[in-house]
């Protein structure tokens, strides 16, 4: 259903972390790898 697609998109966005978003759970090195 649509909800499943939304959840999947959210999971991907959270995993990849969009530019400008700095999750406190991820270390600076991890964020650099994602942003870089």
UniProtKB/Swiss-Prot annotation:
Task of the protein: PsaD can form complexes with ferredoxin and ferredoxin-oxidoreductase in photosystem I (PS I) reaction center. PSAD may encode the ferredoxin-docking protein.
Topology class, membrane: Peripheral membrane protein
One GO BP annotation of this record: photosynthesis
Disulfide topology: none
Family: Belongs to the PsaD family.
Organism placement in taxonomy: Eukaryota, Viridiplantae, Streptophyta, Embryophyta, Tracheophyta
The keyword Thylakoid appears for this protein: yes
Keyword set, alphabetical order: Chloroplast, Membrane, Photosynthesis, Photosystem I, Plastid, Thylakoid
Subcellular location per the Swiss-Prot or TrEMBL entry: Plastid, Chloroplast thylakoid membrane
UniProt name for this protein: Photosystem I reaction center subunit II
CC annotations in GO: chloroplast thylakoid membrane; photosystem I
The UniProt record lists the keyword tRNA processing: no
């Amino acid at each position: 259903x649509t909800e499943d697609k939304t959840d999947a998109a959210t999971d991907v966005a959270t995993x990849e972390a969009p530019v400008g978003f700095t999750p406190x759970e991820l270390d600076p090195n991890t964020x650099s790898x994602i942003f870089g």
